């Protein structure tokens, strides 16, 4: 029997997760909840500027959608605790609104009858933060609410883990060269949160911004908690981003070849490896959570320490979504 999934929040991540779930055997989206009307949601599901047209058939019907012949119920309920998850026998809610980002708030879905909640954002409080194929083995099935971290943390985590496991990570700085997102203005205008830089035209500027990925990494890899810091530079591309990580290593005399070999050996469905001279548009639609770029590895000795700089690509939309769906499937499997 398929795992019944509900998506709360049908924005960029919610819609792309819906698409991705259609390709995963054993998962079925049976309901979505969003305050936008069904006609608009169906249109945005079918057509996507960056990720291309949805290959399935989408039709608006009474009470929701029909997608590839299967009914998906639609709701417009602002209070998650009032959603009919019990009646629909929902196994996992994929929480994509950005509002239910701590355990207490996300608990509203459990009160409504869902068995599990996966938050598509960094979460506050005492929650497990999961980057699939980095620390998903921490899950034991007893969890009711789990965080899927951020797109940048999913890019950073496997790289940082290899450096720490193989060479010893002393400390470091990371920068995400990140595509602009919906929380930036397309034209210069006051920003809704008062951010002067995000108030500027996203497609015309390199915009310094903050990122919580360097700090959040400690929730994924406790051994390096507090060892990383960093920031973001939002750039004029709609999707396709790059994480650069510069670290001091414990091990001495490390070579570029050794670093690249370690990354290649660690590659899997979530963590790719390439020696091709790619650019950001080449990773749009990619399902690796992180793609290590061996051509950008640099090594330098500083006194008796080894300084290493590495880089990994990610589609901040689809890479992250693919990771979320892997975690969702694993979380559901543990509950059977």
From Swiss-Prot:
UniProt site (Activates thiol group during catalysis): 178
Residues involved in D-glyceraldehyde 3-phosphate binding: 150-152, 181, 198, 211-212, 234
Major subcellular location class: cytoplasm
GO molecular function: glyceraldehyde-3-phosphate dehydrogenase (NAD+) (phosphorylating) activity; NAD binding; NADP binding
Domain of life the protein comes from: Bacteria
Known catalytic reactions: D-glyceraldehyde 3-phosphate + phosphate + NAD(+) = (2R)-3-phospho-glyceroyl phosphate + NADH + H(+)
Consequence recorded when altering residue 178 to N: Loss of dehydrogenase activity
Temperature dependence: Optimum temperature is 25 degrees Celsius.
UniProt-listed Enzyme Commission number(s): 1.2.1.12
One of the GO BP terms on file: glucose metabolic process
Keywords: Cytoplasm, Glycolysis, NAD, Nucleotide-binding, Oxidoreductase
Homology family: Belongs to the glyceraldehyde-3-phosphate dehydrogenase family.
Biological role: Catalyzes the oxidative phosphorylation of glyceraldehyde 3-phosphate (G3P) to 1,3-bisphosphoglycerate (BPG) using the cofactor NAD. The first reaction step involves the formation of a hemiacetal intermediate between G3P and a cysteine residue, and this hemiacetal intermediate is then oxidized to a thioester, with concomitant reduction of NAD to NADH. The reduced NADH is then exchanged with the second NAD, and the thioester is attacked by a nucleophilic inorganic phosphate to produce BPG.
NCBIfam families referenced in this protein's UniProt entry, alphabetically: GAPDH-I
Protein name: Glyceraldehyde-3-phosphate dehydrogenase 1
Provenance organism: Staphylococcus aureus (strain MRSA252)
Encoding gene (name): gapA1
